[in-house]
Structure formats: structure tokens, C-alpha cells
């Protein structure tokens, strides 16, 4: 394929980063006590992520002003450049100069333990955001791209990735209404501002608990809320009456949890001793090495490079290509740290004008317990699976080798972005993979195979109901974001959609859609979860289920899917990986097959 050949040629022209003596085995980096490594704040120190300006909060202003000056230069340059591939390269460099400040600041504003850094990062985000709004309504800039895309001969001469990136930049312009007349353009800008304000208010409201008078609670449960004052806070409740046999929408999580515990004996404390963080990281490195020729190494960060003493820096190294990028692991709990597990792009990869490749840099944020003097950090099965999930995102970023940072790594369509991370969950639940690293931290005993089997089978309890719930959510999201004005209230639509797509009844006088935060972050895209899971399941079944360490399949996975980031149509990547064109029925059937209690994915022999 043209993209694959061009990628191969690109890789051959890159400078190989050789092995560094600063690298150490990844497991060792996570077995050292975090408390034993204090940030040295004495003397001269570098900046966050190695950015010299960010040795102090004031550096954000310096960095943003530097980026804004470069942006102005690039705008003048692209407007004076004849239409052609160079137009797209300059647009991407312009985007990169802003993203390298905005993406970094977007992370620091929520994760840095020092208020001054968070506030400075917040201001940088606002400043860069204002510039982006101006650029998206800059008519001269828009016309420089329009001249390229309006010339059919020029467009036909572009390679597929360059054409796709040009079209994505044009889409950003049109979302801002720049192609409209002045009156409509102003209306579009005003609507976008209103959408942002309403979205922010909605998200804040989804997290506020309800306060009600105690006298409104049923007498049989009132004694559970003996609190001072006349009000109680209601977060989530379940039925307390054993003989109440009517199943309500809030009951399935409770009862499915009971069934898992009673039928499969999967008490987390039985598993945690086998999942020390160091062992899990070694397992990931081993898996990546066997599948992709990639290893993870710990690297000592420079003074001032990290924001907390327990952050680890990993170098991602290919056996023949050398250094691919860096992953900063912010894994441990601390005061004021957001309670969310996520992946942040700090710097996207791209091919620079000098022929070198700008290495990607990402952060993985988890909330794991700290180790102690006598006890390493031990993960529950859920934590272990989540670690694998987030590392799937990280490797997507590391192995993307796009020419343009605008489509690097995870900067791809939402319904494809979760495929690499969900695929990693299948590896995390395969005994042949788990057996390679799950050892009791004291005795060295391997995790028994039957324990892995029980754990995997337990996840299928009520899985069909869970999937039906996801279908209901996705359908509701599509209707809410369909043709407007809506034919009835959002609550009436909720009731009708629930009765059509879900097996449990709507509860009168409730409006839980007002707390469904995904309507903002995944508006009109909630189906992406099911779509990504279907694709990941098909890739697992057809490429890795027989042998999870299949190097040929791993190389194809990198070449056909990971390497392209968002620079190629997702379905073309899926077709390249599966070597066929899957149908909707194929996707549905693979999701249904995952529910089969006789499904042997996790029980296959290692031979």
C-alpha cells in the first residue's frame, strides 16, 4: 500500500537513537520506594518535561509568548507560499507550535501539586485558546488552504496522508463558520461560545450531589442517614429490602457483584500479591518486546523535569530503530490529584524539516496506592487491566510515525481511538500472557491458572445486560444529537428510548440524563465504545487469540494500525489488519461471541 511504503521509506531516513547507559530495567524503576526519591529543589534546575522555560510558573508566559510569536511568523509564511504540499507542512508546524504549549499546559493545570504552576498553566491554556479562535476565523489563512484544496490537479498530486490532514484543517475552519457570510459567521462563533459555556456548566452540574430533607426518605431506610442537620446527601442507593423482587435500573451492579463474589471467589486480596506494579511493568515490556520488538526502560529524570517525586520516566526503545519516545508515569495517589486514569499527549510526533523525527512524549495518569517499606505497590485485577488499557494508548502514541503531528498517535477518530487500549485488555486476560509476569511478591509462586480462568469468566456475569445498557446509551445519545428541534422533552425521549432499547423500566419522575456527563465529552459519539470493542475483539480473535506473542501479527498491527495515527481512514486500517472488509454483522457477531460462557480465549493451552 502507498501509505505503508511511504512509512517504510520515512523510517529508513530517520536517525536511529542508540541505547543509553542511563536506561535501567523497567521493573526496577517501580520497585524503588517513591518516598525514597525526593525532588532536589536546590541549585539550578531544568524545566518540566525538559522545557527550559518551565523551571518556574512564570515560564509559562515566556513559553506562550514564544509560541505566539512563532505562530505569527508561520501565518505570514503560509499566506505567502504558493499552494502545494508545503502549505500543509506549514499548517502542521503552526499547529505544533501551539499544541506543544497548550497540551503541556492542559496537563499541568490539573496535575501539578503547586497552585502557582496550575494557575500559570490555566492562563496559558486561555491565551493559546484565544489564538486558536483567531486563527480559525483568519480569512487569509483560510484562503491559503482553500486555494490548495480547490485545485483538483494539486489535490490529486498529494499523498493520502497529506490530503487527509489538509481536509482536517479545512474542517476546523468550517466548524468556526469561516466559509459563511459575515452575519452567519458571527452567529456560528456565538453558538460555539454558547456551546462551550453550556457544556462546562452541564459537566459541573453532573457531579453535584442532591440534597433532600430527611423527612422525605422512606422510614425503613431513614436510620441509615443519621446525620447532623435536616438534610442528607444522596449519591447512589440500592434496595435494602430482601423481599423486594422487582428489579430496577440501579440493581444490576449490586446483584452482579454478589454473583461474581459468590460463584467465582474473586476476592481482590487473593490476587493482589501476584500483581506487584514492578512485575506488571516487566510483563508489559516483555509483551511489547515479543510482539513489536519494543522494550521499556527506566530513565532518571533531570532536576525539575517531573512535578512529583514519585513520577517515573520511561524510554520506549525499539530493537533496531532505537529510541521511539518517552512515557512519564504519574501512577500514585497524592493530595489534590484528579481521581481519573487517563493518557495525555504532551508532544506529538512529526517529521521535522531537517529530516529528524520529533519524538512523542506522553503522560499516563493512574491512582495506585504507594508502596511501603515492607510492601510493594500491589494491584487489584481491575487495576492491572486498567494499566494494560492505558499502556495501549501510550503505545499508540509511541509507535505512530506520521509525517504530521496533527494526526499523531491517538489524534484519530473517536470510534477508533479506543481500539488499541481495549485490545490490550484481551492480552491482560490471557493466561499465557499473565503467566509471564504474575508472581507472588514474597514466594515467587505463579498465579494459578484456575484463578485467571475464574476471574475472566466472572466478567461475563450479566455482560449481556451491560452491553444492552451500552446500546441504550448510544441510541439515546444519537437521538439527542439528531435533528432539532427535538419532538419532545429530553426526559420523554429518555423514557421512550429506554422502553425500546433496555430491558428495565423507566422510573417515573427521574431525569438521570442530566448527570450523563458523556453527552458532552462523547456527544453523538457514544457508540464509539461498542465500535472500538468490536474492532478490538475481531483483531484479537483473528490475529492474536491462537498465539498472543505472534511477532508477524504484531508487526502487521504496527504497520497497518498503530503507525498511521489518525492519518488514514480507520476502516482502511482495520481492513489492512484483518485482511478483509468486515461487515456490520461481523462486528455484531464478535460482540455476541464475547458473551459466550464457553468462550475459550482465556483457557487455551500455551502449546
Question: Predicted regions: what is each one?
Answer:
Residues 288, 370, 375-398, 421, ...:
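Active-site recognition of the HExxH zinc-binding catalytic motif
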Amino acid at each position: 500500500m502507498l501509505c505503508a511504503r511511504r512509512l517504510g521509506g520515512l523510517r529508513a531516513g530517520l536517525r536511529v537513537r542508540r541505547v543509553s547507559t542511563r536506561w535501567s530495567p523497567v521493573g526496577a524503576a517501580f520497585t524503588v520506594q517513591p518516598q525514597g526519591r525526593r525532588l532536589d529543589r536546590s541549585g539550578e534546575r531544568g524545566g518540566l518535561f525538559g522545557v527550559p522555560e518551565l523551571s518556574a510558573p512564570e515560564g509559562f508566559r515566556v513559553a506562550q509568548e514564544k509560541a505566539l510569536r512563532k505562530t505569527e511568523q508561520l501565518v505570514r509564511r503560509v499566506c505567502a507560499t504558493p499552494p502545494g504540499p508545503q502549505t500543509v507542512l506549514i499548517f502542521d508546524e503552526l499547529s505544533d507550535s501551539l499544541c506543544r504549549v497548550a497540551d503541556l499546559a492542559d496537563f499541568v493545570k490539573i496535575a501539578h501539586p503547586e497552585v502557582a504552576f496550575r494557575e500559570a498553566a490555566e492562563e496559558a491554556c486561555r491565551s493559546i485558546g484565544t489564538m486558536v479562535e483567531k486563527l480559525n476565523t483568519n480569512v487569509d489563512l483560510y484562503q491559503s488552504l482553500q486555494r490548495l484544496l480547490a485545485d483538483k490537479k494539486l489535490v490529486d498530486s498529494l499523498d493520502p496522508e497529506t490530503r487527509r490532514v489538509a481536509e482536517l484543517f479545512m474542517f476546523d475552519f468550517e466548524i468556526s463558520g469561516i466559509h459563511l457570510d459575515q452575519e452567519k459567521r458571527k452567529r456560528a462563533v456565538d453558538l460555539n461560545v454558547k456551546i462551550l459555556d453550556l457544556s462546562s456548566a452541564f459537566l459541573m452540574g453532573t457531579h453535584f450531589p442532591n440534597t433532600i430533607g430527611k423527612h422525605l426518605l422512606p422510614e425503613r431506610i431513614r436510620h441509615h442517614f443519621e446525620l447532623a442537620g435536616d438534610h442528607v446527601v444522596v449519591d447512589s442507593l440500592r434496595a435494602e429490602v430482601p423481599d423486594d423482587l422487582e428489579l430496577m435500573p440501579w440493581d444490576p451492579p449490586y446483584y452482579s457483584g454478589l454473583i461474581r463474589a459468590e460463584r467465582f471467589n474473586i476476592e481482590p486480596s487473593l490476587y493482589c500479591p501476584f500483581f506487584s506494579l514492578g512485575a506488571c511493568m516487566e510483563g508489559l515490556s516483555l509483551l511489547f518486546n515479543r510482539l513489536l520488538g519494543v522494550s521499556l526502560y527506566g530513565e532518571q529524570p533531570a532536576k525539575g523535569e517531573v512535578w512529583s517525586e514519585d513520577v517515573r520516566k520511561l524510554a520506549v526503545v525499539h530493537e533496531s530503530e532505537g529510541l521511539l519516545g518517552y512515557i512519564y508515569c504519574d501512577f500514585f495517589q497524592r493530595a489534590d490529584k484528579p481521581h481519573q486514569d487517563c493518557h495525555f499527549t504532551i508532544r506529538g510526533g512529526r517529521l521535522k524539516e531537517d529530516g529528524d523525527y520529533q519524538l512523542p512524549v506522553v503522560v499516563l495518569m493512574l491512582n495506585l496506592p504507594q508502596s511501603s517499606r515492607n510492601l510493594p505497590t500491589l494491584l487489584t485485577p481491575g487495576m492491572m487491566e486498567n494499566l494494560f488499557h492505558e499502556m495501549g494508548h501510550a503505545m499508540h502514541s509511541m509507535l505512530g510515525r506520521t509525517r504530521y503531528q496533527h494526526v499523531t498517535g491517538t489524534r484519530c477518530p473517536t470510534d477508533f481511538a479506543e481500539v488499541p487500549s481495549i485490545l490490550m485488555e484481551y492480552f491482560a486476560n490471557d493466561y499465557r500472557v499473565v503467566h509471564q509476569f504474575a508472581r507472588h511478591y514474597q514466594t515467587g509462586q505463579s498465579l494459578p491458572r484456575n484463578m485467571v480462568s475464574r476471574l475472566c469468566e466472572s466478567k461475563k456475569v450479566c455482560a449481556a445486560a451491560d452491553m444492552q445498557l451500552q446500546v441504550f446509551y448510544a441510541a439515546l445519545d444519537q437521538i439527542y444529537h439528531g435533528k432539532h428541534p427535538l419532538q419532545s422533552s429530553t426526559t420523554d425521549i429518555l423514557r421512550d428510548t429506554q422502553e425500546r432499547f433496555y430491558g428495565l423500566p423507566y422510573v417515573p419522575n427521574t431525569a438521570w440524563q442530566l448527570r450523563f456527563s458523556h453527552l458532552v465529552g462523547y456527544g453523538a459519539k457514544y457508540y464509539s465504545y461498542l465500535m472500538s470493542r468490536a474492532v478490538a475483539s475481531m483483531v484479537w480473535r483473528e490475529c492474536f487469540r491462537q498465539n498472543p506473542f505472534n511477532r508477524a501479527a504484531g508487526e502487521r498491527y504496527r504497520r497497518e494500525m498503530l503507525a498511521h495515527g489518525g492519518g488514514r481512514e480507520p476502516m482502511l486500517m482495520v481492513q489492512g489488519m484483518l485482511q478483509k472488509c468486515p461487515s456490520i454483522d461481523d462486528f455484531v457477531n464478535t460482540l455476541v461471541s464475547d458473551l459466550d460462557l464457553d468462550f475459550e480465549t482465556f483457557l487455551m493451552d500455551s502449546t
